[in-house]
UniProtKB/Swiss-Prot annotation:
Role this protein plays: Endonuclease IV plays a role in DNA repair. It cleaves phosphodiester bonds at apurinic or apyrimidinic (AP) sites, generating a 3'-hydroxyl group and a 5'-terminal sugar phosphate.
Residues reported in the UniProt entry to bind Zn(2+) 3: H194, D241, H243
Binding site for Zn(2+) 1: H78, H118, E157
Cofactor binding description: Binds 3 Zn(2+) ions.
CDD domains per UniProt: AP2Ec
Gene: nfo
Entry similarity comment: Belongs to the AP endonuclease 2 family.
Pfam families to which the protein is assigned, alphabetical: AP_endonuc_2
Protein origin, superkingdom: Bacteria
MF term (GO), any: phosphoric diester hydrolase activity
InterPro entries from the UniProt entry: AP_endonuc_2, AP_endonuc_F2_Zn_BS, Xyl_isomerase-like_sf, Xyl_isomerase-like_TIM-brl
Protein name: Probable endonuclease 4
Organism of derivation: Streptomyces coelicolor (strain ATCC BAA-471 / A3(2) / M145)
Amino acid sequence: MSTASSSSSLPRNPVGGHVPVAGGLHSVGLSYARELKAEAVQVFVANPRGWATPAGNPKQDEAFREACAAGSVPAYVHAPYLINFGSHTGATVERSVESLRHSLRRGRAIGALGVVVHTGSATGGRERPVALKQVREHMLPLLDELTHDDDPYLLLESTAGQGASLCSRTWDFGPYFEALDAHPKLGVCLDTCHIFAAGHDLTGPSGMHQTLDLLVDTVGEGRLRLIHANDSKDVAGAHKDRHENIGAGHIGEDPFRALMTHPATDGVPLVIETPGGKEGHAADVARLKKLRDG
């Protein structure tokens, strides 16, 4: 974990990873982060494949928050995967509201800068505008609850384009942002594997920069607040969400180097969600730092 003493000493793009927290946010999560030499961290605050909304451990929360602040380590929460505000099932939508509210409140408690949520899909054979109207009805009130200075941003993460995805290509963020009134607490988490799988070929001399240009054209400057840096086991446009270690997949190293030179990514942390255990994660963090630092 970074030991930088002030934000001015942070690298252009802090590089870190998603860390396990079973046993304690601070005692387990940040210990793992230190072994990765992570400069940024992402955590779950609930079972990512369930609906439970557990209370935090105040001592662990405080220790985590203080350690991240002292080390200038940006922290993020990833909301559970089951959340889908576009679902045709009322119970799923209601649970999605409570689950995301829990993640946002827990995010504030631990000092997280953002809470990442998947953009979901229009289930039940419904048209996208119908599902987006439902997204507005249920997600916008949650954004309006973010009235504290230390509330996290809500970061939308697009999908690989499977099924009736509401948001997979860069331009799909447009209708999503419009549905949510381009709320000031709304941002984007760009997953490189997802956007590649959805059809944006990031390879080649300008693939990454062109994709980032499209994103900025769609949502405006300053909305990109986190990057999930993952290579892809599958080719561009395969619509498969299968992450690979950095440089070992179809994206390759060069696009990640290019990513860290685009104006839109200045100051934006990179978090890996790649396969393997601690050793592989540490290698991916080191590889991205090397690409960043030249």
